[in-house]
């Protein structure tokens, strides 16, 4: 099937894909056509950033759907969020992202609503309206995720 990828410059790229293709595969096809390395690509569909390991079918992307390609700035940063079970979730952030935005990214990957998340870094609970930069969260930083019990603050 054919899908379209629209860049910020307004250019539209046509790609031949299968619904079983992963987002990684799609990024590789964009690299073949446009020469943009996959690690600099962010693909958006229906307002959501698409995760590399998922397939087009997972996002209900059908023939003639249009994805939006946003280039990742060099300032983009990869952090880890560690859950109580010891699982580490990798999240791509910008220094200007709010803690609330980081919680939304955790929700996209893990399905945990932001209201149930408490993020801890350097022994401090992080406030939703502050940014990663406010807490000096940088590439490679590890945040700890604690689940808030209902009614608990």
UniProtKB/Swiss-Prot annotation:
Pfam family, one: ubiquitin
Keyword presence, Cytoplasm: yes
Keyword flag Ubl conjugation: yes
Ubiquitin-like domain boundaries: 1-76, 77-152
Cross-link Glycyl lysine isopeptide (Gly-Lys) (interchain with K-? in acceptor proteins) placement: 76, 152
GO molecular function, one term: protein tag activity
Keywords for this protein: Cytoplasm, Isopeptide bond, Nucleus, Repeat, Ubl conjugation, Ubl conjugation pathway
SUPFAM superfamilies: Ubiquitin-like
Cross-link named Glycyl lysine isopeptide (Lys-Gly) (interchain with G-Cter in ubiquitin), sites: 48, 63
GO BP annotations, alphabetical order: modification-dependent protein catabolic process; protein ubiquitination
InterPro entries, per database record: Nedd8-like, Ubiquitin-like_dom, Ubiquitin-like_domsf, Ubiquitin_CS, Ubiquitin_dom, Ubiquitin_ubiquitin-like
PROSITE patterns: UBIQUITIN_1 (PS00299), UBIQUITIN_2 (PS50053)
Function: Ubiquitin exists either covalently attached to another protein, or free (unanchored). When covalently bound, it is conjugated to target proteins via an isopeptide bond either as a monomer (monoubiquitin), a polymer linked via different Lys residues of the ubiquitin (polyubiquitin chains) or a linear polymer linked via the initiator Met of the ubiquitin (linear polyubiquitin chains).
Miscellaneous notes: Ubiquitin is generally synthesized as a polyubiquitin precursor with tandem head to tail repeats. Often, there is one to three additional amino acids after the last repeat, removed in the mature protein. Alternatively, ubiquitin extension protein is synthesized as a single copy of ubiquitin fused to a ribosomal protein (either L40 or S27A) or to an ubiquitin-related protein (either RUB1 or RUB2). Following translation, extension protein is cleaved from ubiquitin.
Entry similarity comment: Belongs to the ubiquitin family.
Listed name of the protein: Ubiquitin-NEDD8-like protein RUB1
